[in-house]
């Protein structure tokens, strides 16, 4: 089973039922593409995101119709809700009043101090954190005049400007993002931010692109950032169905052992030795394990000679041969199965492992409760 790597120490911030930062696992976030005022469409998309593994969802809040929809949306979903606000402090107040779990707004863009104070007061009263979102493409004019073009230094300076406004009002439930479409710039900005302050960081590569190119760009950039222990929430920005963003985020986190509730697939690239339809089998198993909330590593390999040895790290797997397959656990052969039964037998073994994992988790929870009572 995969081990969870804890992130760099950051200040913990509560967002609804979740804690962001403070050595907790990296949380997956996405954003709806519906018109927020269309409650039914928005809720339906959020339910699809939840099913895919999204843990926090953000909605655009560009006008009063969107802000008015917040209470009904909140009532019908199961994950924390974030309202994305630009400039209009009244929309922030309405979203907070409507029960949103977090707002994304830059206090320096709201206007007069009394407007900022009103938002901070409302956020404090309801325990709603604020995410400061710095974007390389929309840095303040004074920052661009100082540095000439978007730089990591300028992005961190912009973040600190907004942070200090909130800190002066004794508000510290802050999360920060420093996004850029340039991967190297994003990496440098997040590195500098991590050295500069201890607020949780929401990481992402903005405007990454289409499903194919955006996935690669995000994996390269966020992989580099996560490998340094930086990042507390993650969002993949794709010109695609937001469910795809969640799938990509889960795969990236699984690669680093940062997803405690996701199964992983290992499959070989195929070669002339293969006697089974490995590609279709691998795709079927990948779809099957996508919704399994247990850290199981599954292998689908085409060669019975090298397969078990190549997948010693896998919890369970199959290696194909002509007319049959080898079912193995941790590199040791369990039994042979006919080719036509390989997939179903593997699915049964995956289900058994998942049940074992959930049973152990329940035992741990019961033991912890027992210790607490004593």
From Swiss-Prot:
GO BP, one annotated term: isopentenyl diphosphate biosynthetic process, methylerythritol 4-phosphate pathway
Cofactor(s) listed: [4Fe-4S] cluster
PANTHER family from the UniProt entry: 4-HYDROXY-3-METHYLBUT-2-EN-1-YL DIPHOSPHATE SYNTHASE, 4-HYDROXY-3-METHYLBUT-2-EN-1-YL DIPHOSPHATE SYNTHASE (FERREDOXIN), CHLOROPLASTIC
Enzyme class, broadest EC rank: oxidoreductase
Gene3D superfamilies: Dihydropteroate synthase-like, Sulfite Reductase Hemoprotein, domain 1
GO MF assignments: 4 iron, 4 sulfur cluster binding; 4-hydroxy-3-methylbut-2-en-1-yl diphosphate synthase activity (ferredoxin); 4-hydroxy-3-methylbut-2-enyl-diphosphate synthase activity (flavodoxin); iron ion binding
Record family assignment: Belongs to the IspG family.
Catalyzed reactions: (2E)-4-hydroxy-3-methylbut-2-enyl diphosphate + oxidized [flavodoxin] + H2O + 2 H(+) = 2-C-methyl-D-erythritol 2,4-cyclic diphosphate + reduced [flavodoxin]
Function: Converts 2C-methyl-D-erythritol 2,4-cyclodiphosphate (ME-2,4cPP) into 1-hydroxy-2-methyl-2-(E)-butenyl 4-diphosphate.
Cofactor detail note: Binds 1 [4Fe-4S] cluster.
Residues binding [4Fe-4S] cluster, per UniProt: 268, 271, 303, 310
Listed EC numbers: 1.17.7.3
UniProt-recorded name of the protein: 4-hydroxy-3-methylbut-2-en-1-yl diphosphate synthase (flavodoxin)
Natural source organism: Geobacillus thermodenitrificans (strain NG80-2)
Biological pathway: Isoprenoid biosynthesis; isopentenyl diphosphate biosynthesis via DXP pathway; isopentenyl diphosphate from 1-deoxy-D-xylulose 5-phosphate: step 5/6
UniProt keywords, alphabetically: 4Fe-4S, Iron, Iron-sulfur, Isoprene biosynthesis, Metal-binding, Oxidoreductase
Name of encoding gene: ispG
Coiled-coil regions, chain positions: none
């Amino acid at each position: 089973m995969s081990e969870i790597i804890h992130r760099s120490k950051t200040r913990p911030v509560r967002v609804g039922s979740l804690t962001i930062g403070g050595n907790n696992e990296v949380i997956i976030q996405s954003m709806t593409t519906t018109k927020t005022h269309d409650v039914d469409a928005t809720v339906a998309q959020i339910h699809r995101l939840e099913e895919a593994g999204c843990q926090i969802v953000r909605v655009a809040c560009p006008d009063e119709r969107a802000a008015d929809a917040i209470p009904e949306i909140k009532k019908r979903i199961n994950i924390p809700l974030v309202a994305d606000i630009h400039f209009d402090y009244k929309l922030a107040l309405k979203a907070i009043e409507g029960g949103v779990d977090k707002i994304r707004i830059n206090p320096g863009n709201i206007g007069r101090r009394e407007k900022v104070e009103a938002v901070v007061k409302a956020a404090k009263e309801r325990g709603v954190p604020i995410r400061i979102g710095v974007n390389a493409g929309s840095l303040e004019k004074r920052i661009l005049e100082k540095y000439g073009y978007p730089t990591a230094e300028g992005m961190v300076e912009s973040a600190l400007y907004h942070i200090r406004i909130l800190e002066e009002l004794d508000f510290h439930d802050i999360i920060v993002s420093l996004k850029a479409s340039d991967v190297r710039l994003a990496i440098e900005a997040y590195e500098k931010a991590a050295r500069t302050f201890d607020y949780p960081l929401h990481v992402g590569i903005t405007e990454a692109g289409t499903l194919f190119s955006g996935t690669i760009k995000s994996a390269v950039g966020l992989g580099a950032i996560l490998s340094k222990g930086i990042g507390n929430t993650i969002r993949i920005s794709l010109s695609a169905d937001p469910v795809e963003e969640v799938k990509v985020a889960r795969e990236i986190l699984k690669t680093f052992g940062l997803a405690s509730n996701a199964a992983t697939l290992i499959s070989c690239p195929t070669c002339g030795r293969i006697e089974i339809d490995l590609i279709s089998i691998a795709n079927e198993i990948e779809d099957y394990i996508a919704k399994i909330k247990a850290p199981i590593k599954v292998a689908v390999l085409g060669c019975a000679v090298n397969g078990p040895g190549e997948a010693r790290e896998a919890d369970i797997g199959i290696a194909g041969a002509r007319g049959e397959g080898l079912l193995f656990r941790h590199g040791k052969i369990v039994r042979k199965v006919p080719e036509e039964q390989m997939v179903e037998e593997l699915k049964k073994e995956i289900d058994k492992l998942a049940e074992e994992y959930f049973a152990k988790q329940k035992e741990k929870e019961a033991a912890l409760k027992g210790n607490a009572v004593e």
